[in-house]
């Protein structure tokens, strides 16, 4: 196994909406290299990880398999480091990188108890921005060019070429020939993908980020207690929120005796949670009465234009107020984690 770690100086990204969901969380950026697209038949050969350490500093780490027999070793080390973070940023990672890693881990009987929330920039851009209409495609390099980042790339190969390059590397190694040039090209390609992705955060300002988080879900973290919100739905008399417990799962049930009470369910066995909070309709508005909650959240919404006298508007003329809905869910669950569980 070849392991590399070095420090980089990067500008800290700050954006109010981003910080609402991910402020004070331990964030990393990852990209992986494999011998193919199928995790059933292909191998994980290289993982790059950029971990933000504060004060404009970040640590970039790579794990490289010098032979296919080292796959399990680098996968264990890589997943352990990824799992020490709260949020992992990827580009199409929900469709490729993360499922690939988890499938390979399962095949190799590697236990993955703790995994971070995956913020997939591709899914945010594809579903919640106008860039899809403006650009020929949403490949990472295309978006980099649009954001004026292309000049920062130094690698000259594509993902497909990296597969060929790795096979050439293995052949040279079998013949006891010098493999350093091939290895360094692979490492450079992976490094550029990760570092360039870390510079793409400002593209989020061109998205409807609140809507993206409503659709894709978001983390709620208090100390070592972590929840990932996955589904938000409006029913006739309730807003229903469900997701997973990703660390220290617990069993907990809370519900009142009336029809207008909140209901909260946490399952240790399934590592899931869900809660229902009563809502009501007034003309064309869907409203939550904060006074009927088991936790006090009134002061949280003082600056929100859709909050008045203890009432929070969730929907107006079928227009969902994504910021209000998400902010309520996050703060409600934080109160549950901190004051009840």
Regions found by a protein language model. Give the residues of each.
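Short beta-strand scaffold segments in enzyme catalytic cores
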Residues: 47-49
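DEDD superfamily 3′-5′ metal-dependent exonuclease/proofreading module
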Residues: 1-42, 52-341
